[in-house]
From Swiss-Prot:
It comes from Desulfovibrio desulfuricans (strain ATCC 27774 / DSM 6949 / MB). One of its GO terms (cellular component) is plasma membrane. Keywords: Cell inner membrane, Cell membrane, Membrane, NAD, Quinone, Translocase, Transmembrane, Transmembrane helix, Transport, Ubiquinone. It is found in: Cell inner membrane. NDH-1 shuttles electrons from NADH, via FMN and iron-sulfur (Fe-S) centers, to quinones in the respiratory chain. The immediate electron acceptor for the enzyme in this species is believed to be ubiquinone. Couples the redox reaction to proton translocation (for every two electrons transferred, four hydrogen ions are translocated across the cytoplasmic membrane), and thus conserves the redox energy in a proton gradient. The gene is nuoK. This is NADH-quinone oxidoreductase subunit K.
Amino acid sequence: MIPLSWYMALATVLFCIGVAGFLTRRNIIVMLLSLELMLNGVNLNLVAMSYFMDSLRGHVFTLFVITVAACEAAVGLGIVICLFRSRRTVRNDNIVELRG
């Protein structure tokens, strides 16, 4: 059986890669993917802790986080599509205002 510390280390690495990608990239789509990677790291942490503590609370909360992440991705991609249609770019350096 894989020890809990390995799951925690993997979740931390996933979260840190997501944070690094979110802070260093200027493409909004890559920033959304990095945000999803951070949420997946948190989900892995929740599921691992829940499994090792013999509780279903972490699993249930993870389902809610996955649902919210899917909604966030859909809304975020919708906004990115609208920005690309109006400004022809998805770099956040070139977008200074959200007014249409």
